[in-house]
Amino acid sequence: MAYAVEIIGDARMKDLLKGCSAINYHTHKADINGICVELNCQNKDFIDMWSDNFYHMSDHVRPHARIYCVEDDSELHAEYHIESFTMFLFNFDYYGWIKSVALGLAGNILERSHGIYSVHGAAIDIDGRGVTLIAPSKTGKTTQSWGLLRMDNSHLISDDWYFVQFGNGRPRITGSEKNCYIDADIGDVWEEYKPLVTGVKFDNKGRGIGNVRWIRGEGAVIPKSSVSVIILLKRDKEDPAIERRLGVDEALEYLESHDFCNPHQLVRGERDLALRREFFRRYLSECAVFMVNTVCTAEESQERIRKLIKEVI
């Protein structure tokens, strides 16, 4: 994780809240799969991005989780009061971390209290069947998921984070964001996305909130699906295998060895990790699972991924 998270007690939280009460914050509430997460921040640009990024929660709803952004002389870090799901972010200058913390907070509540689990991955509905790409950073997850969105009868659930619930039939998934936090170069591989960036205000990291509906139409984003196919990605030039089907144990071992492909797990106690381990074991067991090694060009990797998907759906 790029930032350290310290778990704090009641006394420290009260001290921090007292200090925050003297700050004139911009405030906005997000609806993240039914969880109300409130952002308190002095940076108006972050508030505007947050408002574009997430579905809105009524101001009359009290927050289930809160984020306070603090600027002081300390190092970049976060302090987390688990009992109240309150996070203090010190000197965060990157919106991507703030929104991931919000998703992590919502995930904590849903995981602990509702049996709903988080996946840091992309999910696309193709002809009514859910496909997810889960991968470590820099292996092409975003590129390949946006490539799949170019298919006929495809709809975006999420390009970054979604929630999973079990029941009758295949695992059910729900998206987390209204609009996507995209890179300025999103159109470099898939040219049809070049017009998407024209109306986006990009931050100091070259990223901004983009609305894929501008390109794919109003129905391009849907809230839910059920998953049939899990694609794991890696980029390993030493491995001659480009694509193959995986068993549950091998797939779970890969995910565990890469921190479940989620650097924004805010709590990592043994109980929490055991819950996630058992979740992923069940999730993998109820879907067809493949590994794709993205050492080829983006276009060739896309062809291979589509071929694997068509074997199942």
Describe these PLM feature segments:
Residues R66-S74, A78, E83, Y117, ...:
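A short, charged
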Residues M1-I98, Q302-I313:
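Long, basic/Gly/Ser/Thr-rich N-terminal segments
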Residues W97-S118:
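N-terminal pre-Walker A segment at the start of P-loop NTPase domains
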Residues P63-A65, S100, K224-S228:
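Non-catalytic, well-ordered alpha-helical scaffold segments
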Residues A2-T27, H120-P136, R150-I313:
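Glycine-rich, often acidic-flanked micro-motifs
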